[in-house]
């Protein structure tokens, strides 16, 4: 056969990014990644976005991923460049955002010697990434990048970190980038166990007070349309988590509100009184459950989730189903029937009438007025938030529909997220209006952007 011309690891990395369909990366150069920056400079298919701080870079990549469905790609240097990613990796890990982050590393013979700008970034981030690895041999580079994109995108999405020693990257090797992935220990299940699903749907039909709980998994799987159809057919009311907001349009007559400590009275009462809680794509985080033994005390619980580890971790469930939310909901749509929920819906309407979401305004104009005006003005906006009071106003009052997306730090609650997230969302969606809503504190945390 013909002998392929060898290329450096830096060249292979750029080739790999193109093969993976990457058109934008968020990068901040430094000594250990300068050769990669040079390779990126020599081509024009991939745009490189330069922030002022690596934390802002990873938040921007995160929102880019959330709003486009692509993988967010980061490139930072070793040492402080890498450690500045930590909060952003944890944010993405909690909220299931696919990222591939490349960190520079000192040459192999210096690793472990406390060399200049050397940290064990794989060790530091082990608990906040889906996978992390140092490329110790040039011949492993292509395979590792291929696996990283596969791991980030599939199953429950998440951030992957690849640490690149400088000498490995300058070494010559094969120009080939693998076409397939063969990971023995990682086989994410997506298809639905039909026996379990039919059992769950039978329970749904029998229930007197059924309730859907939709989490961020419905939005991540982009199953909103199918889920809304299921809700329309069954006539079963819906509550959502903050990350699940928009699983059905927030102006839908069967949408009660968010549950949890920052949720609506009626939504929390519905969870307490329902006899079947049919939950899709949620982790049952402490913000929504309160005391675990008092959560949905009268209900049988169905839990559909892509992540085996999320099922029965916090709440004991009666019917566990490990599946991709979009596949599960599409199958449900084929089999569901209308449920008799008239009395149950009247009870919920009564709670809503007695305890609506209200807000005292001191002076002439309050946060709610601003958000409601925004609802009227913008049809297709992406709304990003920081974390705190203003975030709760947005998650309670902002209209989220098929055309309006909410981008917020849910699991970790990262102040400083909203502004760089808006930049990342706009880069991914140049034709859409992007609105960042921030508090005075969060705004100052990444104000350098």
Predicted features and spans:
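Aromatic-enriched
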Residues: 1-3, 166-195, 199, 342-344
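Phosphate/pyrophosphate-binding active-site segments
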Residues: 3-4, 139, 175, 202, ...
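N-terminal cofactor/phosphate-binding cores enriched in small/glycine residues
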Residues: 5-95
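Active-site diphosphate/adenylate-binding microenvironment
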Residues: 10-13, 18-22, 36-40, 349-431
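Glycine-rich phosphate/diphosphate-binding loops that line cofactor/substrate pockets in enzymes
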Residues: 11-22, 63-68, 93, 151-156, ...
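Structural signature of the thiamine diphosphate
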Residues: 23-24, 66-77, 82-103, 126-179, ...
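Glycine-rich, anion-gripping cofactor-binding loops and their flanking helix/strand elements
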Residues: 66, 216-302, 400-431, 444-448
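Thiamine diphosphate
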Residues: 102, 110-111, 116-117, 312-314, ...
